[in-house]
Amino acid sequence: MAASRYRRFLKLCEEWPVDETKRGRDLGAYLRQRVAQAFREGENTQVAEPEACDQMYESLARLHSNYYKHKYPRPRDTSFSGLSLEEYKLILSTDTLEELKEIDKGMWKKLQEKFAPKGPEEDHKA
C-alpha cells in the first residue's frame, strides 16, 4: 500500500508546476522536498499514519485540479487592485521582492553595508 501512495505523490509532484521566479517560496518545490523527506526509502517506506497521508494527498490533488475554483466560480477574474495575473506574478517574484527590500533600506543602512569592514570579528557580533 505504501508503494501506491508513493507513486501517487510522485505523479502529483510531476504534474505540479514549479515557478522559478519564486526561489525558496514555491509550493511545487516545497511539495517535492516534503515528499522526498516523507518517502526516504521510496516504495519501501512504511507510512506511520496512512489515513493522514491519504487525506493530505486528496487535499493536494483537489488544489492541483482547481476543484475549489470550479466549485466556487467567480463572476469576473479581477482583484481589488485591478492588476492582471501577469502583473501579480511580476510583483511577487523573488527578484522584485529583493529589489523592494533594498529600496526600503534607509540611506544610512546602505552606506553602512557598503563601507563596513567585513572581518571575522564582525561576523561573530551579528
From Swiss-Prot:
Disease connection: Mitochondrial complex III deficiency, nuclear type 7: A form of mitochondrial complex III deficiency, a disorder of the mitochondrial respiratory chain resulting in a highly variable phenotype depending on which tissues are affected. MC3DN7 is characterized by severe intrauterine growth retardation, neonatal lactic acidosis and renal tubular dysfunction. Additional clinical features include a dysmorphic facial appearance, delayed psychomotor development, autistic features, aggressive behavior, and mild sensorineural hearing loss.
Keywords: Membrane, Mitochondrion, Mitochondrion inner membrane, Mitochondrion nucleoid, Primary mitochondrial disease, Transit peptide
Tissues in which the protein is found: Pancreas, skeletal muscle, kidney, liver and heart.
S-adenosyl-L-methionine among keywords: no
GO biological process: mitochondrial respiratory chain complex III assembly; positive regulation of mitochondrial translation; regulation of insulin secretion; regulation of oxidative phosphorylation; regulation of skeletal muscle cell differentiation
Main location: mitochondrion
Protein's name in the database: Ubiquinol-cytochrome c reductase complex assembly factor 2
A Pfam family the protein falls into: UQCC2_CBP6
Chain's gene name: UQCC2
A GO term from the CC aspect: mitochondrial inner membrane
Function: Required for the assembly of the ubiquinol-cytochrome c reductase complex (mitochondrial respiratory chain complex III or cytochrome b-c1 complex). Plays a role in the modulation of respiratory chain activities such as oxygen consumption and ATP production and via its modulation of the respiratory chain activity can regulate skeletal muscle differentiation and insulin secretion by pancreatic beta-cells. Involved in cytochrome b translation and/or stability.
Localization in the cell: Mitochondrion matrix, Mitochondrion nucleoid; Mitochondrion; Mitochondrion intermembrane space; Mitochondrion matrix
Organism per entry: Homo sapiens (Human)
Top-level taxon in the UniProt lineage: Eukaryota
Subunit structure: Interacts with UQCC1. Forms a complex, named COMB/coordinator of mitochondrial CYTB biogenesis, composed of UQCC1, UQCC2, UQCC4, UQCC5 and UQCC6; stabilizes nascent cytochrome b/MT-CYB and promotes its membrane insertion. Forms a complex, named COMB/coordinator of mitochondrial CYTB biogenesis, composed of UQCC1, UQCC2, UQCC4, UQCC5 and UQCC6; stabilizes nascent cytochrome b/MT-CYB and promotes its membrane insertion. Forms a complex, named COMA, composed of UQCC1, UQCC2 and UQCC4; activates MT-CYB translation.
Transit peptide: 1-13
